[in-house]
Regions:
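Collagenous Gly-X-Y triple-helix signature in extracellular proteins
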Residues: 1-187
Length: 187
């Protein structure tokens, strides 16, 4: 069993039934991303691009976190993570959000692009396109190529959501073996 701090950026590990990619150690914890999308969902069922109100945010920090714990994750290992909700056009009206599990921002996509595993479909980011009420449904997304775009928040048929595992402290990590189960996976 290895400690998370012993892994290098880009290394993969299993935790709570999900395979994760280590990004970097930050303060008392480590920033990680699910190696594959965990389920298909709308960003927000009411078509709002504000992460603070997002139905996906509620699910990631509710049922999905519960599923990770049911698969053996320690709930106390998930530390609070503050996300910057600055819109693509520079508006800062939404401020920040604090979560245990969140999506990547556009800034995090760019910063960790070299070690982010490619996926077969586009994924949500939490960055709004704008905070202006006339277009408050647009949310940024990233394609498997790494190119960024935007989609309406209600769209969930093809949009898959990689969960950002906030920070983890003092975790024992087991090497990945064979086929894995993913917590919270939709049928």
């Amino acid at each position: 069993m290895k400690k998370l701090a012993e892994l290098k950026p880009g290394d993969r590990f299993m935790y709570g039934g999900v395979e994760w990619v280590k990004f970097e150690d930050i303060g008392a914890g480590t920033l990680c991303l699910a190696a594959e999308p965990v389920f298909r969902r709308a960003f927000d069922e009411e078509n709002c691009n504000d992460w603070r109100k997002s139905s996906l945010r509620r699910e990631l920090n509710g049922a999905f976190l519960d599923a990770l714990v049911a698969e053996g994750a320690d709930r106390a290992a998930f530390l609070d993570w503050e996300s910057d909700l600055t819109a693509d056009d520079g508006m800062t009206d939404y401020g920040t959000a604090v979560d245990k599990i969140a999506l990547r921002s556009d800034a995090l996509c760019r910063k960790y692009r070299e070690i982010t595993p490619p996926v077969d479909e586009w994924c949500w980011n939490l960055t709004p396109w704008t905070c202006d009420a006339s277009a408050s449904c647009g949310v940024r997304s990233v394609y498997s190529s790494g190119a960024m775009d935007w989609n309406d928040a209600y769209y969930g048929y093809m949009g898959r959501s990689p969960a950002l595992l906030s920070e983890i402290c003092n975790l024992g990590i087991y090497p990945r073996r064979g086929r894995r189960r993913r917590a919270g996976r939709a049928p």
